């Protein structure tokens, strides 16, 4: 003990005489007065001075916080570990954020959860590791009381938000895999952002109470880091500790286990049903064997997700609950510091499990950071395919997607047109079912489709068309030439019989015009992307609507209508069939000039 220059606050703790602030701080740290005194006596410390001690000491210096007399190598070891965790975590999460910001194919609503997880882990490493490392090198807390509170608040906020985000990811995958049809179009970008906002507010709600007297932010372990006070054996502190672990640790853990259990069971049940449908030939046996491999891989990844969550936060929970139960005398400074380091290390494996193992993230990182291609084991063949897919997303393509229902015009049996719109984004499956990494879907596009249908009950002379219906795709190439191709297998087109004396204007209204009964009208779906290419010529759409006569603009650049006029255009889009009664069917489609 120091005599003369310091006065005793409690047994074994001393403060400088000229620093009255130390007395107030040490007295406020009741968590470290009684319980830590007994805990430190359990540590077998080698003699470092002529007078050996194993209790907290404060040297005559400008630092008001007490220190723990432990070997220097203990501080340096923890400092080196936390520095490694911080650098690795910041690099890994930065790669995930960078790949998301550069790649258009990754900007899906479901991937917003992965990005939020990367942001919280990055901020956790950025705010905790440098300060923890600095104080470990000084072997004491050097940033004052306000610095301790701010440090502990950031650790609590980002740590809680990370755990809640893990739960949100598990719930999102649960609905997509177990209820695929019901989940189509449900998760939009706006809803995903709203969910993340709720997660941040929820985390903030559990991080602010120590500022208002419910528990407190105090130094912990080797007194080189800070956290909330879980050592004080008072009703207020114990209530906060118990509620915090129920609503922040135990409930998310139960939800994660529940979701991944039913995800595994759903995929296993589906594979068994498919196996019963198929025969017992050699090919089906190979497929069954491959499904079993995928199931086992999925089970291992789900197990890793749960185990890493438990390993990261269970030690911290165990220490806090031990103090909550009144057995804080058994806790040593090392037992308080090591769980904090393990919890912060979760920022390393989260981006690996949820993002970097995903094929599209690896390809995006390898594309934009070529020096990491060999480290990520990305072959050049896959990289070229990924580059081609990126180029294809920058073209205006007419397509029909089962998961995209936005902007669809549908005509009811009463003859009225109705606009039905769905979610403005897509929710898709992952590239590999067994990967269980983030959901990936193609970037959503603004799609407009017009379907002309006719209730067969109103038309007694209806005869189905023998030719297969199709849709036209309008593809813009780098040369600026538009070409028309047949639709994919997934395209769904509706061809109906147009009622006599009725046709559609470009506004969707029904107008009376003389049209032959047997005419079949088809209007293709047009996908309009917001991105333009510098190689494409400027396109100005014009519309030509005729209420009296109906004309068809074919694929020829110039064609005479019923009145002898000539319709010209650089490119014309039409699927209508000519009829012997009238000249041609009206072209209610844009002409690109």
Curated annotation (Swiss-Prot):
The chain crosses the membrane at residues 78-98, 113-133, 151-171, 192-212, 244-264, 301-321, 337-357. The keyword Nucleus does not apply. Keywords: Cell membrane, Chromophore, Disulfide bond, G-protein coupled receptor, Membrane, Photoreceptor protein, Receptor, Retinal protein, Sensory transduction, Transducer, Transmembrane, Transmembrane helix. One of its GO terms (molecular function) is G protein-coupled photoreceptor activity. Residues 1-77, 134-150, 213-243, 322-336 are extracellular. Its main location: membrane. The modification N6-(retinylidene)lysine is found at residue 344. The keyword Cell membrane applies. Disulfide bonds join 148-226. Residues 397-449, 547-593 are annotated as: Disordered. GO terms for cellular component: plasma membrane. It is found in: Cell membrane. InterPro entries: GPCR_opsins, GPCR_Rhodpsn, GPCR_Rhodpsn_7TM, Opsin, Retinal_BS. Residues 414-449 have a biased composition (Polar residues). GO terms for biological process: cellular response to light stimulus; G protein-coupled receptor signaling pathway; phototransduction; visual perception. It is a multi-pass membrane protein. Pfam families: 7tm_1. Residues 99-112, 172-191, 265-300, 358-593 are cytoplasmic. Photoreceptor implicated in non-image-forming responses to light. May be able to isomerize covalently bound all-trans retinal back to 11-cis retinal. Belongs to the G-protein coupled receptor 1 family. Opsin subfamily. This is Melanopsin-A. It comes from Danio rerio (Zebrafish). The lineage of its organism: Eukaryota, Metazoa, Chordata, Craniata, Vertebrata.
